[in-house]
Amino acid sequence: MSRPSSIYRPGNSSLTSRRIHHVIPQDSFPLLDFKEISICLQSCDFIANEELVSRPTSQYIKTLLEQLLDSFMGLSADNINGMVRNVNKNDLSMTKTQDAQMEEEPENGGSQIEDDDDITSSVRLILLHRGAYEFFSICGVNDFTLMDIMRPEPQRIRRILSAVVNYARFREENSVECEKLVSISEGNLEQLKVVQNENSRLSNKINDLKYKIEANETDEGNKKATLKQITTYNSKLENELKKLKKNQEILTLEHSKYKDEKRRLIEKLEDHNYLIMESNKELDKLKSYLLSNPEILTKIIEDLKTNLSEYQTNLADLESKNKNMTISIESFQLVEQELKNLFRILEEVLNDLTKEETSLDKLNKYQEFKEQQNLTLNDLNRQIQQVTRQLNNTEEKIKRLRHQSSERSEASKQKLISLKDGYDTLVKERKVKEQELNKKKDFISELETKMNGERSNFQIELRNAELAVAKLNSHVKLYLTEMNKKVD
């Protein structure tokens, strides 16, 4: 990424005069003052006034690092937040366990939420430090730590930002040559991604087709086995159904006989009850003759006892028959219930038979569909072979592109190394020339001091000479005046 051209101005004497030329031995870049760092970073649209740079806070360093990573590394704040979310998803099982503990201990819910916030902020801080460490390592600073973010020191921040400014200037100087290589590399990467995506898509398609073929073969085998089992089960049910029909016919005849016998016995019981009532009436009539004719009464009693014994015998027979009939009725009811269950089972069997016929129709359709799928599979196999050949050709192209890219990258690295060596040589020559210039300035200042001293001595001698000349003139004038007086 090219930076604004104002960051590097070789002819700007105001920036050069403010630069501090003392270099830390382990660093390969000059240490700049806070004012120059602020101007250079602001020219790159970073928030960096002199007060913030000279008195950095933790929050400002975090904001500045996010801006630097977004501009130079392409790692935005949204990317960092996405990484934090991925880390939180990986800890989801632990979070569920903690949630279960929170349900058992609800009084710890607030502290758990605070712990989650602390974990999120800590993960974000670690990811920010990793990205910044990688960037500063490229710039030449290999000792960037978390304390530089949490408790920044002005001198360390000054050194780190000096490395950033130096890196930005170097990129600005070589941006024209690097942009071509970057564009070529990006194009190669895009082609590589497209080919890889196509490769993965074809692989997934091949796997899906293999899975469908195996599933169809497995389903067909299961359907054949299930059909045989259903046929065997249906034949058994048909035999049982025939037996049940015969039993039903026999039980129906017995049930009709039972009904006739029951009706006959009920009629006979009614007749006996009627006879008992009539006998009771006759007994009431005979009571009046009890005392008048004991012999007749005795005979009647004997006859009645005989009739009673016969009636009791008949009654016992009827009761036993009644019990037997009740048991038969209950057994018939059970049989009838079983018949109803059997009819219901028969209906289910018939439904199963209809379903079986439907399944057979579907099976025929599936077999036809399978044949079509086999034809389609053959076509797909041919297509897969074609795609495989294309994939091999593409892989060869990718290898050639990678080889070309590596060669170009190696050439660009060599060129960058030579440019960096030239830059270091120029910096050293500039330092030597500046030292010579300082020596010349000191020599000139000494000469000016000597000239000023000589000038002052010359002025003093000049004034003394002028005074001597004035005295001499006055003596000459006085002498001439006296000589004129003597001549006159």
UniProtKB/Swiss-Prot annotation:
One Pfam short name? Nuf2_DHR10-like
Taxonomic classification: Eukaryota, Fungi, Dikarya, Ascomycota, Saccharomycotina
The record describes its quaternary structure and partners as:
Component of the NDC80 complex, which consists of NDC80, NUF2, SPC24 and SPC25.
Task: Say which family it is in.
Answer: Belongs to the NUF2 family.
As for subcellular location, the record says: Nucleus; Chromosome, Centromere, Kinetochore
Keywords attached to this Swiss-Prot or TrEMBL record, sorted alphabetically, are: Cell cycle, Cell division, Centromere, Chromosome, Coiled coil, Kinetochore, Mitosis, Nucleus
Record PANTHER family: KINETOCHORE PROTEIN NUF2, MEMBRALIN/KINETOCHORE PROTEIN NUF2
Q: What is its main location?
A: nucleus
Under Gene3D superfamilies, the record lists: Ncd80 complex, Nuf2 subunit (1.10.418.60)
Name the domain of life. Answer: Eukaryota
Q: Which gene encodes it?
A: NUF2
**Disulfide pattern:** none
Coiled-coil portions: 186-479
Q: What does this protein do?
A: Acts as a component of the essential kinetochore-associated NDC80 complex, which is required for chromosome segregation and spindle checkpoint activity.
* InterPro entries hit by this protein: Kinetochore_Nuf2_N, Nuf2_DHR10-like, Nuf2_N_sf
* Residue ranges, compositional bias (Acidic residues): 101-115
Q: Name one GO cellular component term.
A: nucleus
Q: Which GO terms describe its molecular function?
A: microtubule binding; protein-containing complex binding
Q: Name it.
A: Probable kinetochore protein NUF2
Offer one example of a GO biological process linked to this entry: kinetochore organization
Region annotation (Disordered) maps to: 96-115
